C-alpha cells in the first residue's frame, strides 16, 4: 500500500497551473476531471511546456528562449499516469486532424462555430468535380437516334398522291344543294314496286302498315253457326218443313214433364191413328229439360202407386 501511494502522488495546483479560459479546451464528454484511478488531467501552458523541455534537454543542448506571447493554438490533453504508447497515439491522432484542417483553403465557408473554435468542412475530392461539370456542360453523350425514312419517300410508286388544288372552295349553301341533288337522284333510281316490311314505311302517313290484332276464333264460329241456322230457317219456310222432336218422346220424358209441370208441345204424328191415314194428325206430348243432369231414380209419378198391380214385390219373409 505504501508503494502504491508513493507511485500515485497528487500535486496541488499552483499559480503556474492556473490558466485563463481561452487557453483551455475540453470536449463535451470531459465534464469531470477526476478519474477513479487517480489520474489527473491537466492542460499545459506554453510556458510549462517550455520549462519541461528545458529540464528534459541535456546540458549540451542550447537552451530554448521562452516566448512571452502565448500561442493561440489549442494544446492536446495530457494524461498523467498513462503509458507512453497511449500518449503517442493520442498525439498522432490530433496532429493528423490539425494538419488536415490547415491544408484546407481559407476561402471555404465555415459551417459552425463552437467555443470560439472554427470547424471547416473538408474539400471534396478533385476527381468527382470535373466529371460532373463535363456531364452538365455536354449533356447526354449518347449518339442521336436516326429516324427511319418513310415508305412514301423511299418507294413513291406504291403510293397515290391526291391533291385538292384544282377544287375551288364552296360555301355552305352550295354544299347543301349538292347534297340534295344527290339524294334526289338516289330516290329516282330506287324501284317503284318496292314493298316495305311491316312498320318500315318511310312515309309519315304509314300507308300499308301491317296492324296485328288478336285472333277471334269463337266469334267467327258463332257467326258461321248463325249463318247456317238462317239458311235452314229460310229453306224450311219455303218448303213448309216441320221440326219434329220425336227423339225426345218417351215414357221417361212424360214422367219428367208431369213432375216438373212444364208445358206440353203437340207434335203431329201419322202413327197415332193407323186406321185413317188421311185423317187428322194425332198429337203427342214432349217435355223439355235443362242442361243440368239429374238422376231419374228420385223422380216418380204422382198418380203411380208403388203397391199397385203394376208393381212387383217379392214374397215377404
UniProtKB/Swiss-Prot annotation:
The keyword Membrane does not apply. Residues 146-300 are annotated as: Interaction with SNRNP200. One of its GO terms (molecular function) is molecular sequestering activity. The keyword Cytoplasm applies. The modification N6-acetyllysine is found at residue 214. Residues 20-37 have a biased composition (Low complexity). Residues 74-101 are annotated as: Hom2. The lineage of its organism: Eukaryota, Metazoa, Chordata, Craniata, Vertebrata. InterPro entries: TSSC4. Interacts in a RNA-independent manner with distinct U5 snRNP-containing complexes, the mono-U5 snRNP and the post-splicing U5 snRNP-PRPF19 complex. Interacts with SNRNP200; the interaction is direct, excludes recruitment of C9ORF78 and WBP4 to SNRNP200 and negatively regulates its RNA helicase activity. Interacts with PRPF8; the interaction is direct. Residues 1-78, 123-151, 247-317 are annotated as: Disordered. Belongs to the TSSC4 family. Keywords: Acetylation, Cytoplasm, mRNA processing, mRNA splicing, Nucleus, Phosphoprotein, Spliceosome. Residues 1-19 have a biased composition (Acidic residues). Residues 147-183 are annotated as: Hom3. It is found in: Nucleus; Cytoplasm. The modification Phosphoserine is found at residues 57, 64, 83, 92. One of its GO terms (biological process) is spliceosomal snRNP assembly. This is U5 small nuclear ribonucleoprotein TSSC4. GO terms for cellular component: cytoplasm; nucleus; spliceosomal complex; U5 snRNP. It holds the Pfam family TSSC4. Protein associated with the U5 snRNP, during its maturation and its post-splicing recycling and which is required for spliceosomal tri-snRNP complex assembly in the nucleus. Has a molecular sequestering activity and transiently hinders SNRNP200 binding sites for constitutive splicing factors that intervene later during the assembly of the spliceosome and splicing. Together with its molecular sequestering activity, may also function as a molecular adapter and placeholder, coordinating the assembly of the U5 snRNP and its association with the U4/U6 di-snRNP. Residues 198-238 are annotated as: Hom4. Its main location: nucleus. It comes from Rattus norvegicus.
